[in-house]
Amino acid sequence: MIIIKSDPEVDLMRQAGRITAGARTVARQMVEPGVTTRQINREVHKFITKSGASPCFMTDGGFPTAACISVNDEIIHGVPGDRVLHEGDIVSVDVGARYRGFNGDCAGTFPCGKCSDEALRLIRVTRQSFFEGIQFARVGYRISDIGHAVQEYAESYGYSLVREYVGHGVGAGLHEAPEIPNYGKPGHGPRLQKNMTIAVEPMVNVGGYEVRVLDNGWTVVTADGSLSAHYENSLLVTDGEPEILTFADDI
């Protein structure tokens, strides 16, 4: 069931979104050669709790850490640990914060030091595909209109869109209805309504869209070992343009 938020609930979503966006910025600022993914996660966790929120990937999603940190061919759900980042890596950080019963969810992929032109282009295209998609995150459009726009843009650069993992509603639940695929034909699915809150999150691969899950039961990687990038924000559907609840100028 799609949950339409009340105005007071929207205000709480805004506060959760600001904290979540701040945590993502903390992570971005730490991405550099020699840093471990565990160190990044520790600072993300600290920022969330000091902001009066809780790390909802742990409390709601059962994930072992506050942040998912995925490197190179890892798409999502990378588990932070002793892995050391190296020059040329691309690092996807997905974070979530729960504030007074409501969740924010956002992600971004960041270059570690000097990266290849191909890697930087992938990051740029993935980010822009999000903005292409949310042009249709407006009252009256259908859910598939978002994913169709994401797919058209990313595929125009020769990339593929992950199909087994999708965007979603977000609110009191970390993952709510509806599911929001990053591909498909336009004109399908529920119509968007004012005060829906959703997370749109393109996951874009240089190679094919097929994926596999590592033995840890969490980390999803590209089946062909190609690079992958991820960009996500939580949104509020309004009477006009969508409001990005997890917006940050630097990401």
Residue ranges and their predicted role:
Residues 1-251:
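Active-site neighborhoods and metal-handling regions in enzymes and metal-associated proteins
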